[in-house]
């Protein structure tokens, strides 16, 4: 991994690395925050998945998470949201193609050549983190919007691998809303059964479980009713007896003003779980 940015932050280092991804067949950037104790001991890892139009920069520059990651001694890994490059398929819209990988493995041309974000986040990136950084095997996952969807899917499909999961404003029923339907039709085809592998509410209804889910949702979020539908997640978790910490916030929208307001509580939540044995 090639170091391309290095910034001192709260006694640690906010770095950005570039590497070639075998899963995605392109060069990828990834943000890695190394807290002060990373120089002396191995630490647990929180993976953060960003939302539509984002890259690795949004979370590391806008959330203020470094203060809390330093306090709780957690390495934070923030990858890009899709494969990148002039040779990678793209679309002339914000919710498909580059910047909109949806953390799935595409099966349809032209997307299936590079869009294997599920494999990248689940397999390749954790292997690289273990090879290059002082990380323990204990990891948690979180994200925002499309990234909240990805975090929930990865945790639900791999409950023994992630200690905890949380999300800000996640797309909880992508097979039922325009963002998900349009992306899934392009990436996965018209067989809607295939869509359900990447739909948190559907996965839970099929019996996939995690110990607990934490979600924060702003009630002034323009996408709340049409695209996100947080109450669907709350309802299915109640039906399936999955513990939740779902909080609704008056006045907060879909932006990083919202994420930055509560990211400290999410990192503390994950730190508590990661440090339990």
Swiss-Prot record:
Cystine connections: none
Catalytic residues as annotated in Swiss-Prot or TrEMBL: 145, 221, 254
Signal peptide boundaries: none
UniProt xrefs under NCBIfam families: fghA_ester_D
Its job: Serine hydrolase involved in the detoxification of formaldehyde. Hydrolyzes S-formylglutathione to glutathione and formate.
The protein, known as: S-formylglutathione hydrolase FrmB
Keywords: Hydrolase, Serine esterase
Top-level taxon: Bacteria
Enzyme class: hydrolase
Family note: Belongs to the esterase D family.
Example GO molecular function: S-formylglutathione hydrolase activity
A cellular component annotation (GO) from this entry: cytosol
Annotated organism of origin: Escherichia coli (strain SMS-3-5 / SECEC)
GO biological-process terms attached to the record: formaldehyde catabolic process
EC number, as in UniProt: 3.1.2.12
SUPFAM superfamilies, alphabetized: alpha/beta-Hydrolases (SSF53474)
Reaction(s) catalysed by this chain's protein: S-formylglutathione + H2O = formate + glutathione + H(+)
């Amino acid at each position: 991994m090639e170091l391309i940015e290095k910034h001192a932050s709260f006694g640690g280092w906010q770095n950005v690395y570039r590497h070639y991804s075998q899963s995605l067949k392109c060069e990828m950037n990834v943000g890695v925050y190394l807290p002060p104790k990373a120089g002396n001991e191995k630490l647990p890892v929180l993976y953060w998945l960003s939302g539509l139009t984002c890259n690795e920069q949004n979370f590391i520059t806008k959330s203020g998470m470094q203060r809390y990651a330093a306090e709780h001694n957690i390495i934070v890994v923030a990858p890009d949201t899709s494969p990148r490059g002039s040779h990678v398929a793209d679309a002339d819209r914000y919710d498909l193609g580059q910047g909109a990988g949806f953390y799935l493995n595409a099966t349809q041309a032209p997307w299936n050549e590079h869009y294997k974000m599920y494999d990248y986040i689940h397999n390749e990136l954790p292997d690289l983190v273990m090879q290059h950084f002082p990380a323990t095997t204990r990891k948690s996952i979180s994200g925002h919007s499309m990234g909240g969807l990805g975090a929930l899917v990865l945790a639900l499909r791999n409950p023994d691998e992630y200690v905890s999961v949380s999300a800000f404003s996640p797309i909880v029923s992508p097979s039922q809303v325009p963002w998900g339907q349009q992306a899934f039709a392009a990436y996965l085809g018209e067989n809607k059964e295939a869509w359900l592998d990447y739909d948190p509410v559907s996965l839970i209804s099929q019996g996939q479980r995690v110990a607990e889910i934490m979600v924060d949702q702003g009630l002034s979020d323009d996408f709340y009713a049409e695209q996100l539908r947080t109450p669907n997640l709350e309802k299915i978790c109640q039906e399936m007896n999955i513990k939740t910490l779902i909080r609704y916030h008056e006045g907060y929208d879909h932006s990083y003003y919202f994420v930055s307001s509560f990211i400290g509580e999410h990192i503390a939540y994950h730190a508590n779980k990661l440090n339990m044995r």
